[in-house]
A protein has these predicted regions:
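A contiguous active-site-proximal alpha/beta segment in oxidoreductase catalytic domains
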Residues: 92-176
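Rossmann-like dinucleotide-binding domain that binds NAD(P)(H)
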Residues: 181-259, 265-271, 343, 347-350
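N-terminal Rossmann-like dinucleotide-binding module
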Residues: 1-43
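A structural signal for well-ordered alpha-helical segments within the folded catalytic domains
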Residues: 14, 71, 99, 124-128, ...
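Beta-loop-alpha module in the N-terminal Rossmann-like domain of NAD(P)-dependent dehydrogenases
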Residues: 42-107, 123-133
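NAD(P)-dinucleotide binding in Rossmann-like oxidoreductases
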Residues: 239-322
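C-terminal helix-rich "cap/oligomerization" subdomain common to oxidoreductases
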Residues: 32, 60-62, 110, 217, ...
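Local beta-strand N-terminus motif with an aromatic residue
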Residues: 29, 58-61, 157
Length: 363
């Protein structure tokens, strides 16, 4: 298996390469290119130019540049013969880029090659528990712990909450600072718009939520509004502010007609907070899918009675193994779904970008 990367930044170093080492026993053939000549990663052979990378015999190409350059890289990649092109989230970064991307994907032969990736779309535990098809990889808290089908129809779900509340640290002035999601070290980047929580991490929650609802029989209907949005110091984002990144936001709306609340926070304190979904059922029970340390945690909550399962491993490793690479990949098991999956990710990014316009004003 031959893999290529356009962009050799932090997400490749801290997420992709560790995940590939976890999945495969033997090293893969990886090649890559980055505009910054000093960027070299162990295990990735650097190509002298992007043209040479795209001419290489690559099975799957990952577009892992900064989000503003995803579309330019994708356009060049589509001119190559590489059969599978996976674009990191968000698939594009501006509303004007969305129109260009839609034009590219209007060609069926191009749409069949391009998969817009959000690794949270692999977090399907809540759906599995709801349908009574929990993967044996989920480890029960108690021996002989079982749960049959929990949800028989979509109208049994009365509300969904989505969360991504990341742990944070403090700088010398006592102000909150973001932490790298993979290493836990302080994030030295100066986060600016559009890299606030609405686009940067809202994409994760929305992808997980929509894939779950879709698998339970939902449709593509989607609407959201911004209830609150503040910077890392808790100050409201002002109309006309095109510089300050949102540090925290509350979004509210409907997915397939179900009321939803999405809680996003990049500065949730040293312990962080919830990272996943809570499905509230009409009989009072709750299906909770969370993340704790290096494990996903699934719970069926019925008052004081809680059944719990855990799934160890990095989310990226599960996503690459179950959706992107090998015989289980979406390209292999359901090639017709590749374009539809990309369309859903594009719809989500477009809506979130429009929320930014409403929050800050046209830009």
């Amino acid at each position: 298996m031959r893999l290529g990367f356009i962009g050799l930044g932090a997400v490749v170093e801290t997420a992709y390469l560790p995940a590939l080492r976890q999945i495969f026993d033997t090293p893969l053939h990886c090649v890559g290119f980055d505009l910054r000549p000093e960027r070299e990663l162990p295990g990735v052979v650097r190509s002298p130019s992007l043209e040479q990378l795209l001419a290489s015999p690559i099975d799957t190409l990952f577009v892992t540049t900064s989000s503003l350059h995803h579309l330019d890289a994708l356009e060049l990649a589509l001119s190559s013969t590489i059969p599978r092109i996976v674009v990191e989230k968000p698939v594009v970064a501006t509303l004007s880029q969305i129109e260009r991307l839609k034009t590219l994907l209007a060609k069926p032969e191009a749409a069949a090659r391009v998969l817009a990736l959000d690794h949270w779309m692999a977090r399907s535990g809540a759906m599995q528990l709801a349908l009574g098809i929990l993967n044996p990889a989920w480890q029960p808290e108690w021996e002989n712990q079982t749960a049959g089908r929990v949800v028989n129809s979509l109208d049994e779900i009365v509300k969904i909450e989505g969360f991504l509340q990341e742990p944070s640290g403090f700088n010398a002035a006592g102000e909150p600072v973001a932490l790298n999601f993979a290493t836990g070290e302080p994030d030295t980047r100066q986060l600016r718009h559009p890299d606030g929580v609405i686009i940067d991490i809202g994409t994760h929650v929305l992808a997980m939520m929509r894939e779950t609802v879709r698998a339970l029989g939902g449709n593509h209907a989607l609407s959201l509004q911004v209830i609150t949005a503040t910077d890392r110091l808790g100050r409201p984002i002002a109309t006309g502010d095109l510089l300050t990144a949102e540090g925290e936001a509350h979004l509210q709306g409907h997915v397939s007609g179900i009321p939803v609340d999405i809680w996003l926070n990049k500065y949730a304190g040293p312990a962080g907070g919830q990272k996943g979904l809570r499905l509230h059922l009409c009989d009072g029970r709750i299906i909770s899918h969370d993340r704790c340390g290096t494990e996903d945690v699934l719970e069926l909550i019925d008052g004081e009675n809680v059944q719990r399962w855990t799934l160890p491993g990095a989310i990226y490793a599960h996503c690459l193994a179950e959706h992107i690479l090998g015989e289980k990949s979406l390209y292999e098991r359901a090639p017709g779904e590749v374009a539809f999956t990309t369309q859903r990710r594009l719809e989500e990014v477009e809506l979130l970008l429009k929320l930014q316009q409403q929050l800050r004003g046209p830009h």
